[in-house]
Amino acid sequence: EWVPDIWIEDVFAACKRAPQHTYLFLTKNPQRYLDMGHAGKLPMERNFWYGTTITGPETEYFGASCVNTFLSIEPLLEPFSADDCAGFRRLGEPLWVIIGAMTGPGSKRKQPKREWVAAITEVAQSAGVPVFMKNSLKDLWGGPLIQEYPEGMVRVDGE
């Protein structure tokens, strides 16, 4: 909230001048997206993706059918039940889910369980939502990481 709207609007304007790129905007304050949307200040460009960082099922997030939205569940600190995962649709289905573990000092004490990651992945994929597992899950997952991208999003390697 300490960031003035004009700063955010300036970033959006700069991004609009380079439409060949895909932009991921990530916040822990999803109310800001709602406020900007109600004020007519949230661009609805096809290459703009609005994400919310959440760490558990109780965290509020932004979802809207008129813009590209995603969830960044990182660090995953607690399990999501099937009901919690189905609740992703309460504000509009995210078009992408990113999952990651805590990294850095002290992170070994706060690692998610594999079944937590599997539950989120299963619900997302059954709804047709691509899942991207961050490299921080490599040891926990035990197999090749699922690293899917939304349809139409250009990957860094150009695919």
Where are these regions (language model features)?
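C-terminal accessory extensions appended to soluble enzyme cores
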Residues: 137-159
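Conserved AdoMet/S-adenosylmethionine-binding subsite of the radical SAM
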Residues: 1-132
